[in-house]
């Protein structure tokens, strides 16, 4: 029963987070946003989901049918697993819970790449390969960030009593940048936002397949914001920092232009990694 309730809460969170995103983007662009569907637009995401679920499924003739259908399901499964495990208090308080979280994040890289390859489309393959390269490179930084509490405070659980963010603001900013890159959010949405990619790895997906990838992406955003708020802001109200992170993700999309691919790589190799390595040397050896 716990798993069913948590999955329903995950879907509702994604639904209303998308509504919040459309409202924030509309207000930043001096527009109104959804306001016609029942209760002044509150039920708009539910109506959109129902419409997409009843659309027909198109299978490209050159695609791998097994991976084409399995990839969206696997992507959503990994994202929901992150969401479920966060609310399982017995799990997150055990040793090495951060490593298990990193394992799920690492595995979640493969479904979009397999989806791009299985679609049989040049645009999908190119988008899937870019998504794989981008996320794998930023996972190195994510690994260092999430293991930082181990080196500094000798603990490796998500729920901790230490307040890290009070003197490690650089680590928190780095985590936010990695969050945007790992979840393909602006300004790092290069796997599906570039003109030559059409829609990236999910170009050939519509209806239910698109819904599953959509739910997986937003569920991963919410999960990573929850983990970041618990890991770095335990001395403060966790939900305040959690909602602040969600709003910052939306404001970044509305205010920051998309970066070039070379700038994406330069940030990781010349800014984030050297800075974090210097912090590790400072806290561990000094």
What spans do the regions from the language model cover?
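Core, highly hydrophobic multi-pass alpha-helical transmembrane subunits of bioenergetic inner membranes
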Residues: 1-286
């Amino acid at each position: 029963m716990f798993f069913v309730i948590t999955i329903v809460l995950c879907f509702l969170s994604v639904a209303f987070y998308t509504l919040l995103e459309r409202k924030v983007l509309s207000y930043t662009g001096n527009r109104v946003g959804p306001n016609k569907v029942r209760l002044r637009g509150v039920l708009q995401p539910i109506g959109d989901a129902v419409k997409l679920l009843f659309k027909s499924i198109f299978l490209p003739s050159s695609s791998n049918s097994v991976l084409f259908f399995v990839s969206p399901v696997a992507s959503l499964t990994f994202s929901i697993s992150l969401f479920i495990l966060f609310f399982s208090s017995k799990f997150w308080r055990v040793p090495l819970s951060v490593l298990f979280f990193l394992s799920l994040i690492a595995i979640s890289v493969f479904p979009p790449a397999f989806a791009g390859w299985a679609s049989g489309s040049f645009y999908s393959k190119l988008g899937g390969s870019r998504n794989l390269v981008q996320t794998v490179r930023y996972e190195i930084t994510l690994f260092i960030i999430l293991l930082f509490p181990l080196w500094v405070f000798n603990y490796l659980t998500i729920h901790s009593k230490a307040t890290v963010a009070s003197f490690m603001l650089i680590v928190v900013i780095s985590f936010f940048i990695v969050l945007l890159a790992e979840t393909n959010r602006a300004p790092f949405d290069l796997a599906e936002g570039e003109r030559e990619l059409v829609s990236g790895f999910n170009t050939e997906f519509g209806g239910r397949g698109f819904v599953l990838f959509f739910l997986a992406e937003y569920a991963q955003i919410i999960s990573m914001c929850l983990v970041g708020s618990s890991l770095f802001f335990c001395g403060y109200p966790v939900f305040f920092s959690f909602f602040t992170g969600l709003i910052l993700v939306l404001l970044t999309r509305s205010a920051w232009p998309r970066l070039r691919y070379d700038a994406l790589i330069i940030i990781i190799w010349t800014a984030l990694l050297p800075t974090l390595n210097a912090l590790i040397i400072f806290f561990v050896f000094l």
